[in-house]
Each structure stands twice: as C-alpha cells, then as structure tokens.
C-alpha cells in the first residue's frame, strides 16, 4: 500500500501535504515558564474541583 519508490518522491509528497504550515505568530494561550534572576523557574499547579 505505502511502497516508497524514491526518497525524493516521498519528500515532494510530504511538502505538498504540509504546505509549509506552521505557527507564524506566537500563541497567546501558550503557557511559558517565567525565570527569576538566578535562572530558576517555578509553577503553581491548581486542580479544578
């Protein structure tokens, strides 16, 4: 079913499927760890009821 004939053909198919889609801008909902001056980070984990 999925027989590879050449790696170039596979790369072309992958490029066509991906379409170079990606994250062009930074996601505002993404959480990022904040570091202090010493380079240490901390987080508070809260469990919802």
Curated annotation (Swiss-Prot):
TM annotation in the entry: none
Keywords for this protein: DNA damage, DNA recombination, DNA repair, DNA replication, DNA-binding, Metal-binding, Zinc, Zinc-finger
A GO term for molecular function: DNA binding
Tagged with keyword Protein transport: no
Keyword Zinc-finger in annotation: yes
Domain of life: Viruses
Any GO BP: DNA repair
Entries under InterPro entries matching the protein: NA-bd_OB-fold, Phage_T4_Gp32_ssDNA-bd_sf
Role summary: Binds preferentially to single-stranded DNA and therefore, destabilizes double-stranded DNA. It is involved in DNA replication, repair and recombination. Binds ss-DNA as the replication fork advances and stimulates the replisome processivity and accuracy.
Subunit organization: Homodimer in the absence of DNA, monomer when binding DNA.
Note: Interacts with the polymerase and the uvsX and uvsY proteins.
Protein name: Single-stranded DNA-binding protein
Organism, as annotated: Enterobacteria phage RB9
């Amino acid at each position: 079913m999925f027989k590879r004939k050449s790696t170039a053909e596979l790369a072309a198919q992958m490029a066509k499927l991906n379409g170079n889609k990606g994250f062009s801008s930074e996601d505002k909902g993404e959480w990022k760890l904040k570091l202090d001056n010493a380079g240490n980070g901390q987080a508070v984990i809260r469990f919802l009821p």
